[in-house]
Amino acid sequence: MYRKISFGDFQTGTIGISVKKALIEGPIRFLQKEKQKMGKRLSYESIEASPEIQNWLTQFAASDALAAKSLLSRLEFISRDEYSEWLLKELASLSNQDKSAIYSVRKFDKDDGNGCLWQKDGKIQLRPAQTQGSEDFVSSIISNANRLYNKCFLDHPSLMELRDYRIRNIILVDDSIGSGKRVSDFIAMMTKSKTFMSWWSFGFIKLYILCYARTVQSETYIRKHIAGSDHGQRINRVSSKIQFISHIVYDSYNVHGRWGENLQSILSLCMSYKKNK
């Protein structure tokens, strides 16, 4: 019944995949047509005045229309341009240090490369032929940054390139992080390589995780599941080898703060349509 939105806009008030599935292209087209700015929320007046949104609302039962409007009014839409400008700015600040490697975080199938990011010959696992949505968009920004900043980044390098260039800083880029599992799984695929794991264990590698929006809880999850120890007596503690850089950081448990007084009706709406999808 529902169509997923493209990367063009995402929201920081997520309460689960059911909300994301409730978003389709009508509100997105409206925002793009009106050239809304970063973090723009839809007013009830704009919701009522938009033919695109009114058409979007027809998929809901009349009794659910108010909850659907409440959901829309609490979303914050971020444009592609806004995200791109933020990411390029952050990459510029990191371009002043030694040459770094950049990888766009993506989800792999469990059987890809026996769980390792790199193949046996040291080359990175091939990207799938089908589109990866936001990951493809992030990859295009990375390529642009490399041209702008005098090729100070290695774009998805092999293990041999990491070794030959003596790379010490690795940047992992994502659009937004919820639970942290996708990033954690990606790092686990990196440390699956004995060579990379050796560099990581001896403190030769530092990870920078760049994402526009993330939950407070995701940082805890990623640190907990990454290889190594954060014990105070360890020389190369995990916490000293990983840094998070985000524009928006929010508490995933503060659902009332994000969804307002109509939280319960929004939750009921999402759960109802999740069951019926």
PLM feature segments, named:
Residues 2-277:
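PRPP-associated nucleotide enzymes
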